Amino acid sequence: MMEHKLLDALDAGAIGFTSSRSNGHKLPEPDNRPVASYHASWEELSQLVCLMGKTGRGVFELSREREARSPDPAVRKAANDRLQELAVKSGVPITFGIPAGSPGTADALAMLDSTAEAGGRMFGQTHTRGISHVLSFKGRLQFDDFAEWARVRALPEDEQRKIFSDPEQRKKLVAATKSGVYRTGGGEPRKPNYENMYVMYSAVSRNPTVAELAAQRNVDPVEVMMDLALESNFNQLFMQFDVATVPKNDEEALATLRHPRTVMTFSDSGAHVSLIMDSSIHTHLLAYWVRERQAFSLEEGVKMITLTPAMAWGFTDRGILRQGSIADINVFDPATIAPEIPTIEHDLPAGARRLKQKSKGILATVIAGKVTFKNGEHTGALGGKLLRSSAAGVM
């Protein structure tokens, strides 16, 4: 049945298929069960990938198992050897996320090269800054599941402000954060790491951490968060990075971004619209890594967000300005292009919450030859269409 479904999807223009072996992909608590693909045998997965290889079409994308990031080199090697063997045997391009700063980062980058040398195709997906959760008092906080906090957070904002301003109430709320049990999986905020949680004043440059501001003010980090919320009418955003996916410094990030077999494209925003905002990694690349750090030339930066991903995913009709290619074009000012601070919107069905992030410095966006955005405003033109692929990646 699975084989027939896969072939039908490829015939309909699917780019390939994905699977998750990550223990972090779980159903919401209290269920907390892993997604179904987590239990699939490696033999079953290999059979599907090899079937796709026989068609000469498709890319296989994998959310990898924890063994790939194990602190034990032997465990990492076994996981990498198995994946490389599949890439060579099937002939299918295989792609997965390579977070900078992980114990398995260097091994994964080396595997990209050794796979190519062995005759396989493999490319890694990288990030310009690392996956983070965007938290706020208008949105989601790590403490919201605790009874003491849930009671307060269910109140209107005016009532919440009174409680967050009351010294005795603040003590109770701070105490609750010390004893509560935090979520460990799924798409929910993790336990606070105040040394790795940043107060989002800028969407480009480095921001102070909650821990740094707490030390300056000589108060508990949770009190800093309350104070900043009160000072900003609850609009202040906080970014908490996953310590397993965030680079410790610029050099670690550049090691993944500069590798010739990686694509700057890793994002989880589509799955977690109210918690994660990675759609700005392209403007972040141009603002931070190209303009501010000058780690890449403008031409290199543009190629990283156009031709490189197009070729990796098998789209030979776009990603470059030439006669006959699809006219998907952004016209931007290199001196000002940058992501803006995200905002929280309630425009999903039933008023559900999502994060929205705009950019500045983009003068016009052209989709299939139609100007769809001009100076940040939608023109009414709808040039986009569902992308279909009939060829595998060529990296």
Regions found by a protein language model. Give the residues of each.
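Hydrophobic alpha-helix feature that most strongly marks membrane-spanning transmembrane helices
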Residues: 53, 88, 117, 215, ...
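Active-site neighborhoods of metal-dependent hydrolases
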Residues: 2-28, 33-34, 38-40, 44-53, ...
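Divalent metal-coordination and catalytic microenvironments
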Residues: 13, 125, 218, 268, ...
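Acidic, glycine-enriched loop/beta-strand segments at the rims
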Residues: 237-248, 253, 297-302, 310-344
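C-terminal cap of metal-dependent C-N hydrolases
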Residues: 251-262, 281, 331-385
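Short loop/turn motifs at secondary-structure junctions and domain boundaries
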Residues: 203-204, 310, 354-357
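Short, solvent-exposed cationic patches
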Residues: 386-395
